[in-house]
Every structure is written in C-alpha cells, then in structure tokens.
Regions:
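Phosphate-ester processing/binding pockets and catalytic centers
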Residues: 1-360
Length: 360
C-alpha cells in the first residue's frame, strides 16, 4: 500500500506575520524504508548526526552540499517528492479576502470564486497596500485583522475598525487610496462583530489547505488506498478530524478539473497517523526538503546555497503555492472559466452529511 510521509517548516500557527519565519513549507515523499536507508547511506554517511534536520545540517557548507545532492536526486525522479509553499504575509491577505470581503460580496450577489476573482483581489491588495503606502502599513493592517480574527473580542474588532477608518479619513481626497480601502471598511458596518464571532475556528491556520493540496496531488498519481504518516511534532494533529473527513475513502466520488489539474475525490486515505521521525526516516527526508525549499525562497539570489538549490531544480518540486504575483486577469491567473464555488459547495455538502462544520 502506498504510504506518504509529511513534514513541514515555518509553522507558526495562526500567526502569519512572524518576521523571522515568513515562509511555510510542507514536503512529502513516498520512499520505502529500504529506499530511504539507501539514500541516507549514499548521501549522508559522513554527516555523523543521529537525526537529519535541515536547521542543523545547513549550518555547515559541507552538509549543505549533501542537502543539495538530495534535492538533485529528488528532482531526477520527481514523482516521489512534492512540496507546497506559502508566503505567509500574502496568505494573510488571501484570508482577509476569504473571510471578510467575500462574505459581503456574496450577500451582494457577487461570486468572487468565479474566474479567480478572489485570487485577483488578494494580489491587488497585497501589491497596492504596499505600493500606495508602504510595507509597514500593509503589515499593520494585516496584524489588526489577524488579531481580530484570532481574539474575536469587541476590543480587537473596534481596534481593527478604527485603524481602517482612520486610514480612510486620511486619504479622502486621494481617489486611488480611497478605492483600495473601500474593499476593507464596509464589512465593519454591514457584517459587523457578529460575523467575526461566528467564523469557524482557526481560520488563519494554513496547514490543512496545504496538506489537502498535497493529498490531491498524490491522488492524481495513485488511486489508492494509501496511508499518510505525519511528523509527531506537527500541529496538524489538532485538525486531524477535518483532514480525516475530506481524505477518507467513504465520501462520494467527485472530480473538479481546475487550473492546477484535476481534484479527485475520494482521496482514499484509509489511515493517517503521527510518528517519530527517528522511527520513520522518510520524515527526516521531508524535513530536509522542506527546509531547503524554505531556504531557496528566503535567501537572496546572490547567496551560494540559494543558487545551488535552484541549479538542482528545487523549484520543480513545488506542486502549488500561496504566493503573491501582480496578475489580476483570469487569463493571467489561469482561471478563466473556473468557478471555485462549486468545490466549496460540494465540500459543504460533505461536511453537512458528516455533521461537521467546514473550516477555511
């Protein structure tokens, strides 16, 4: 039975604005125990570490070379390895669109999931909040929304509302800045504090969406059934019940042909468990790949390690991402004719049948 191993790096829970960890990466592989041991023996035999961890190995140039060799091996036959990455500050923007702007648009009869309008909105806000103000202002706005969505208190609601209204009043004579803020302030009046209180729990936690995307990628390669083994130290255990719901083999079949290929249900996962990386060494390889992917995205282009990772093809392991671009048209986004609302409606039906709430 195929088994997929998963580990992550850069997870900070619902705090997507931690300056020291701007990137979140999940990595997965389906190497067998014998294949994994062969990889470790052939590449890392001279490392002398009881456990292979990217944070430790990447400190020494010689060990970085070993990691690059692992990436080169993975990209030579990429069907065994996949990564999913998220730019966490941009992810915060997408969640403001998802839980603050889209609900009001829906009430007004607009479908932001059609033709990737939600994606375009997030790109526009991310670029314009910095372009028309600065990076500091964008982070200040996102931090206020993050605090509001996490605390769900009237104090945090008023704090966020006052920030946006003060910014709006300061640019009344500036047509362009006023237009940007017009996407943010109406929900305070028209949705109100009750909307914030009624949101699902953990809406700023992006670990589950990444794992689902990886799961759908594997489902496209293997009909299943299959097993998932996640690192025991992962916080995914908190949302295992929701993962189990959408990955199980007993939900009704469905297929959604989207911009990144087909999403096929059921995923046919018959078991998900959390294991010690010392016992399941495939998890150690996931840690190395996730850490290297994060480094390749964080380090400047002139950095030697960055250059070697890209030369090894690490970018080719990324199957999907939450990442900002200046693209806003359906054609640029690759979402012309795509209606993401159909997937959400189906997921809501699945959750309703299982009598469990949908989370974003």
């Amino acid at each position: 039975m195929p088994t997929f191993y998963v580990d992550e790096t850069g997870f900070t829970g619902e705090d997507l604005l931690a300056a020291d960890q701007p990137i979140f990466v999940q990595a997965t592989n389906d190497f067998t125990a014998s294949e994994t041991q062969k990889i470790i023996d052939s590449i890392f035999s001279d490392v002398g570490a009881s456990e292979l961890k990217h944070n430790n190995l990447s400190r020494k140039p010689a060990h970085r070379e070993r990691i690059v060799e692992l990436i080169r091996l993975a990209t030579s036959d990429p069907k065994h390895v996949a990564t999913w990455v998220a730019h966490k500050e941009y992810a915060a923007v997408t969640l403001v669109v998802e839980w603050w702007i889209e609900p009001l648009a829906y009430q007004s009869g607009l479908n932001l999931y059609k033709d990737g309008a939600n994606h375009a909105m997030a790109n526009m806000l991310y670029m314009c909040l910095q372009g028309f103000w600065d990076e500091r202002f964008r982070r200040k706005v996102l931090l206020a929304f993050q605090r509001m969505f996490r605390a769900r208190t009237k104090e945090r609601f008023d704090e966020c509302r006052n920030l946006i209204e003060k910014a709006k009043d300061a640019v009344l004579l500036d047509e362009y800045r006023s237009e940007i803020l017009r996407y943010l302030w109406p929900s305070f009046e028209l949705l109100g504090f009750e909307h914030v209180v009624g949101l699902p729990q953990h809406v700023f936690d992006i670990a589950l969406p990444g794992l689902v995307r990886l799961g759908l990628s594997w489902r496209g390669k293997h009909e299943g059934p299959w097993e998932v083994i996640h690192d025991r130290s992962s916080n995914m255990a908190k949302q295992k019940w929701l993962w189990d719901m959408f990955s199980s083999a007993d939900i009704e079949p469905a297929q959604f042909d989207g911009p990144h290929g087909a999403s096929i249900f059921p995923m046919n996962v018959i078991n998900t468990r959390f294991a010690d990386s010392m016992a399941e060494k495939q998890i150690q390889l996931c840690d190395l790949i996730a850490g290297a992917t994060s480094a390749s995205l964080r380090l400047p282009e002139g950095d030697e390690y960055h250059a070697k990772l890209f030369d090894a093809g690490i970018q080719n392991l990324i199957i999907d991402s939450i990442w900002p671009t200046p693209d806003v048209s359906p054609e640029e986004l690759g979402k012309a004719g795509w209606d993401g609302n159909k997937v959400l409606e189906w997921l809501s039906e699945v959750a309703a049948k299982k009598k469990a709430p949908v989370q974003g």
